[in-house]
A protein has these predicted regions:
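N-terminal secretory signal peptides that target proteins for export/translocation
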Residues: 1-3
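Generic extreme N-terminus detector
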Residues: 5-6, 346
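Eukaryotic scaffold repeat domains enriched in small/polar residues
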Residues: 23-381
Length: 381
């Protein structure tokens, strides 16, 4: 009796499986007949295509000199893209970066239209560059990590680069990791390799500080200290290399805790909410109007899409080396992606620190809109 029931159950299971497989095969056959799929492909650039040879050599690159590491990008308009670079370097990287070409502006075709060389003496390692989405005057902000006689600082320029309007400068020379972390109560300007800025609707801004200090510091629009949260460590609310910050429409703060391989989420007052673990090397966070949280992973060379709840929804991207190893890359290949931004036309820009180059990604014709990065999500006062 028991064997009979088992046999009947197996027969029923086989019938259901056969019907399911038949339905799946029929669906594939129908898709093939209707041309509903594209043969081949590896989705390396996701829903975007890359403008090949868009990033160009500087006019003064001669005698084997090329760009240093491209560290930051801010899209002012689709025809005005501000780029931060670690100066120049020899093409084969035998020498440290030279003291020029730290901030340049390119147009929609990638042509250099401005070089802010008048400010070269302020820079050694410009880390990232920003324009606050809440600022009608479109000031340009730069986080400088310092070194080689340059102090760590936060710099704010007029949009055209003609004037330096604010400078938050660490009075000390750059400290080592051990020296910085020995100071358990750093002051408002005791920077520890500052890394990232994020802006709030009321004009205040957040500083991720950074490589050596484990804290998020809030300042007024004029650079006055307001508050801070965080400490060095791996527990909830602690950090080991704050490298990316984004704020959603509900004023929640998302922080890429790079060396702890996670994103942490906080209230606007810095109260810990949760962590998203097992994100290998998160370096930048961008939240769009559809509530998608986009995370750039530098080691995986990948763009990751999450929900506001932390669910992984999609990803794309792949590594591509260039001529420094004697082999050519391919358009859109990533090499230690470092910062990203979007322009008003939906084009994506990624600063490739290991390239060194800046990539411009444009949406593919007919791309699935759910896979495209939308406009930046803004908060309310």
């Amino acid at each position: 009796m028991t064997f009979g029931r088992i046999g009947a159950g197996l027969a029923l299971f086989s019938l259901v499986t056969a019907l399911a497989c038949g339905a799946e095969n029929q669906a594939r056959s129908n898709a093939s007949a209707s041309g509903a799929f594209t043969k081949g492909g590896d989705d390396r650039t996701g829903p975007y295509e890359v403008l090949e040879a868009w990033w160009k050599a500087a006019p003064d690159h001669t005698d084997g000199w090329t760009w240093g590491s491209v560290s930051g990008v801010a899209a002012d308009t689709p025809d005005r893209i501000i780029v931060a670079i670690w100066g120049d370097q020899k093409a084969q990287r035998q020498e440290r970066p030279g003291g020029s070409n730290y901030l340049v502006v390119v147009n929609a075709n990638g042509d250099i239209v401005e070089n802010w060389s008048q400010w070269d003496s302020l820079f050694n390692r410009p880390h990232q560059v920003y324009i606050s989405p809440y600022d009608p005057d479109r000031h340009v902000w730069v986080v400088e990590r310092g070194g080689n006689g340059v102090h760590e600082q936060i710099l704010k320029f007029t949009n055209n680069g003609s004037e330096l309007v604010m400078q938050l400068r660490d009075p000390q020379s750059v400290l080592s990791r051990e020296e910085a972390r020995a100071n358990l109560n750093p002051g408002p300007l005791d920077f520890g390799q500052p890394a990232v800025l994020a802006f709030l609707p009321d004009g205040h801004f957040l500083l991720g500080d950074g490589y050596h200090n484990g804290r998020i510091v809030k300042y007024t629009t004029d650079g006055e200290y307001v508050s801070e949260f965080g400490s060095v460590g791996s527990g909830p609310g602690q950090f080991d290399l704050v490298h990316g910050i984004a704020v959603d429409k509900n004023s929640r703060i998302y922080v890429s805790d790079r060396m702890n391989h996670r994103v942490q989420v906080f209230t606007e007052d810095g109260e810990y909410i949760e962590e998203w673990p097992d994100i290998y090397d998160p370096v930048a966070i961008f939240i769009d109007e559809s509530d998608a949280v986009w995370v750039l992973d530098a080691t995986l060379n990948r763009m990751l899409k999450y929900s506001l709840a932390g669910e992984l929804l999609d990803y794309w991207g792949a590594y591509a080396e260039v001529s420094s190893l004697g082999r050519s890359g391919w358009p859109g290949g990533m090499s230690l992606p470092h910062q990203m931004d979007m322009d008003e036309d939906g084009n994506l820009y990624i600063a490739e620190f290991g390239g060194p180059w800046l990539d411009k990604f444009v949406p593919k014709s007919g791309a699935d809109p759910t896979r495209l990065i939308g406009k930046r999500q803004l908060g309310t006062n």
